[in-house]
Structures are given as C-alpha cells and as structure tokens.
Swiss-Prot record:
Keywords: ATP-binding, DNA-binding, Metal-binding, Nucleotide-binding, Repressor, Transcription, Transcription regulation, Zinc, Zinc-finger. Belongs to the NrdR family. InterPro entries: ATP-cone_dom, NrdR-like_N, RNR_NrdR-like. Residues 151-176 are annotated as: Disordered. This is Transcriptional repressor NrdR. It holds the Pfam family ATP-cone. Residues 167-176 have a biased composition (Polar residues). Binds 1 zinc ion.
Amino acid sequence: MQCPFCQHTDSRVLESRSAEAGQSVRRRRECLQCNRRFTTYERIEFVPITVIKRNQDRELFDRSKLLKGVATACEKTGLTALQLESLVDDVEAELQQQAVREVTSTELGESVLTKLQSLSEVAYVRFASVYRQFRGIRDFVEALDQLKESGDGPLPSVLDEPYEDTAQPTIMISPQ
C-alpha cells in the first residue's frame, strides 16, 4: 500500500477490524519510510447492475431509488424502516448473485412484489398499482384476487361477496 505522505510502497498493518456492518475492513497502517500512520479500507467491489426500463432506456441500479419506491408503498402499514432496508438488501443480494449484469424493470418489480406479499397486503397492492400501472378498479380487483388465491394471508370476506350499492338517492330541498 502506497503511503499518502511520502509515496513509499511499503507499510505494515498495525490493526485490522471489521467496518460498515461487515461490508469492509478498516486497516490502520504505518509507513516503513516516514513512520506516519494512515487508515485504509477494503471493500467488496460489486459489478454494476444495469436496469432495462420499459422504454428500453438503461440506467444503473439505484438502491436508494428502489428503497424510496418501497417506502412510499409501505407508508402507514406498520412496517419498520429496518424491514424495508432488509427487503431492499435481499433484492440487491439476489441481483448480485445472478450471472447476468442486466435486469429488466419487470423482473425487479416482480422480485419486490414477491417479498412485499409476505410482509403487507396493503403495501403489495400499492406497489403493484404503480409498478403495473393500474388503470382502474378492475386492476385492483385482479391484484386482490391474486393475493387471495396465493393464500399467503387472510383477506376480508367482503371480497367474496358481490358489491351492491344499496344507498338510496338523497334529494335536498332548500327553503327559499
């Protein structure tokens, strides 16, 4: 390791410890030429993953963008920030383990939906509504039917009954 002060290439390691939750190693070094101390970090180098969007544009995978989308879908669902971070960590780990360096936004979205399904039905439907570009109530009903068929969680029995509008029209007469 080259000394940042005198550019000498020999140094000795004084101390090593895990850093950043085990994602890197922090090393305290001493230059053998000038005897000054400096710190280095060793990190795992991940190969960048490219996301192919619907319009065929390509952009680098952005973990924070995915986390923001998931967090928006999970607002007021009771899921913790730690659960959301873990979900995004799992998706990112799956991407890194694949031999392919490009992934479609469809594959990415389906991976998120699979994980959300077991965490929160509400978050699942919210994320699906944006990701799958729901156009109307039928799209929501289809998503709810898929959840019901998967059997991963109880859905309200009200979905088993056809909707009937039993409200009577109200006529307001104002005095003149």
